[in-house]
């Protein structure tokens, strides 16, 4: 269930803060956004990507010099939606620190590796999975051929970025992403997808 679906069911906790001017209530995600914490929970799609991008841009406008924490628990999803998040992470001035909690797969793992170097983390029992781009073109043969060429170009683009972000040779990344490649948190650190496995706050 996505965070949006959970919100639709009215299951997102509310936080009430006291101030000299009275009480103010926030949903938990809005309150955490005040602390520069952004979540990607569930599938990466146009809706979740638009929310994440908007939050990153808002936090940059609030303070371009202060890091943003990006927590990821996602099975992946749309490549184009994920690349919108990736490009925004690289575009904005603040460093984006990434943290895997639970599971970061496919585009989720790609975005985990996209954090600022030295600021990519995983909790110890998280799982990370990388694989090649998935496609599902239908229609006339010529259209399928056009889509196949585009998918191969996208696959090559993502492998090159992943090789750059992890420090792994491109040929190794190509081989490893041919099929689902699961890693523990420690293996993800060794691979270069994260910089540190953390068990508690320093």
Swiss-Prot record:
* Cellular compartments per GO CC: cytoplasm; endopeptidase Clp complex
Chief location category: cytoplasm
Instruction: Provide a GO biological process annotation.
Output: protein quality control for misfolded or incompletely synthesized proteins
Catalytic function, reaction form: Hydrolysis of proteins to small peptides in the presence of ATP and magnesium. alpha-casein is the usual test substrate. In the absence of ATP, only oligopeptides shorter than five residues are hydrolyzed (such as succinyl-Leu-Tyr-|-NHMec, and Leu-Tyr-Leu-|-Tyr-Trp, in which cleavage of the -Tyr-|-Leu- and -Tyr-|-Trp bonds also occurs)
From the UniProt record, which GO molecular function terms apply?
ATP-dependent peptidase activity; ATPase binding; serine-type endopeptidase activity
Could you tell me the EC number(s) of this protein? Answer: 3.4.21.92
The active-site annotation reads 106 (nucleophile), 131
Localization, UniProt: Cytoplasm
Q: How does it assemble?
A: Fourteen ClpP subunits assemble into 2 heptameric rings which stack back to back to give a disk-like structure with a central cavity, resembling the structure of eukaryotic proteasomes.
What this protein is reported to do is described as:
Cleaves peptides in various proteins in a process that requires ATP hydrolysis. Has a chymotrypsin-like activity. Plays a major role in the degradation of misfolded proteins.
Q: What is this protein called?
A: ATP-dependent Clp protease proteolytic subunit
Q: Which gene encodes it?
A: clpP
């Amino acid at each position: 269930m996505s965070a949006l679906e959970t919100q639709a069911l009215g299951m997102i906790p509310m936080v009430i803060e006291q101030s000299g001017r009275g009480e103010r209530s926030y949903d938990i995600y809005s309150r955490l956004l005040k602390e520069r914490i952004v979540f990607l929970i569930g599938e990466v799609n146009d809706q979740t990507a638009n929310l994440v991008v908007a939050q990153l841009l808002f936090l940059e406008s609030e303070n371009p010099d202060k890091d943003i924490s990006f927590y990821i628990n996602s099975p992946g999803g749309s490549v184009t939606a994920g690349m919108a998040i990736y490009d925004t992470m690289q575009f904005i001035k603040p460093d984006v620190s990434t943290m895997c909690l639970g599971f970061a797969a496919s585009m989720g793992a790609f975005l985990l590796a996209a954090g600022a170097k030295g600021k990519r983390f995983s909790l110890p029992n998280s799982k990370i999975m990388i694989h090649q781009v998935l496609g599902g073109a239908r229609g006339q043969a010529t259209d399928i051929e056009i889509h196949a060429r585009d998918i191969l170009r996208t696959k090559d683009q993502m492998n090159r970025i992943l090789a750059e972000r992890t420090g792994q040779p491109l040929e190794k990344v190509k081989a490893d992403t041919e099929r689902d490649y699961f890693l523990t948190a420690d293996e993800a650190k060794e691979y270069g997808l994260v910089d540190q496995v953390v068990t508690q706050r320093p």
